A protein has these predicted regions:
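N-terminal intrinsically disordered/low-complexity leader segments
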Residues: 1-3
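Conserved small/polar residues in nucleotide/adenosyl-binding loops
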Residues: 158-162
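Short, charged helix-capping/linker segments at alpha-helix termini
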Residues: 23-24, 147-151
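Helix-turn-helix
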Residues: 8, 16-58
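Amphipathic alpha-helical packing segments from all-alpha helical-bundle domains
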Residues: 107, 116-146
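Hydrophobic alpha-helical connector segments
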Residues: 54, 68-104, 155-156
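Hydrophobic/aromatic residues within well-ordered alpha-helical segments
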Residues: 48, 55, 59, 63, ...
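Solvent-exposed, amphipathic alpha-helical segments
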Residues: 8, 12-19, 65-66, 108-111, ...
Length: 162
């Protein structure tokens, strides 16, 4: 038995869901992509919904998350922050396999639309992702604003003392 088969199924299903859409992707398509039988795929995933749920939770949402480095950059200079920050869509597209380069936004939109259709909890999960992102950005702006105010106060003190 292939010890990495479950992960390979998830990875190949993700690519197929991105390129073909969830509705148009069958277990046979996934099986062909991993060079196994449909039964081998069904050994790990009893239904298409189970496979979709796993792909969304193990590939899509982890790729959407902020990297730990962004916490460090939150208190840095604004230009440094802006150079490093990527929104959730950019982060997911950057995680796509090389063979999907060039049409990332189209694949992203197709995936989100399909996931919304297949997973009842997807809208809530997506909303939570965007809420966390909004909170992070708000906090980053507050920190940078406070730094700017402090810088202005220091500069005005320097100017007054001259």
């Amino acid at each position: 038995m292939d010890p990495n088969l479950k992960q390979r199924i998830i990875d190949e299903a993700y690519v197929l869901f991105l390129t073909k859409g969830m509705k148009q992707t069958s277990f046979c398509d996934v099986a062909a992509a991993v060079h196994k039988s449909k039964g081998a795929v069904m050994h790990y995933f009893s239904s298409k919904r189970h496979l979709i749920d796993t792909v969304v939770k193990m590939r899509f949402f982890p790729a959407s998350q902020l990297s730990p480095e962004m916490d460090y950059l939150e208190g840095r200079r604004w230009d440094e922050f802006l150079r490093s920050y990527k929104n959730p869509i950019e982060r997911v597209i950057d995680s796509f396999p090389e063979k999907l380069e060039g049409n990332g936004l189209m694949y992203y939109m197709q995936f989100v639309s399909s996931a919304n259709e297949y997973m009842d909890e997807f809208p809530q999960m997506y909303h939570e992702l965007l809420t966390r992102e909004q909170d992070f950005l708000f906090n980053a702006v507050v920190v940078i604003y406070k730094q700017s105010v402090d810088d202005i106060q220091v500069l005005s003190l320097i100017h007054i003392s001259e």
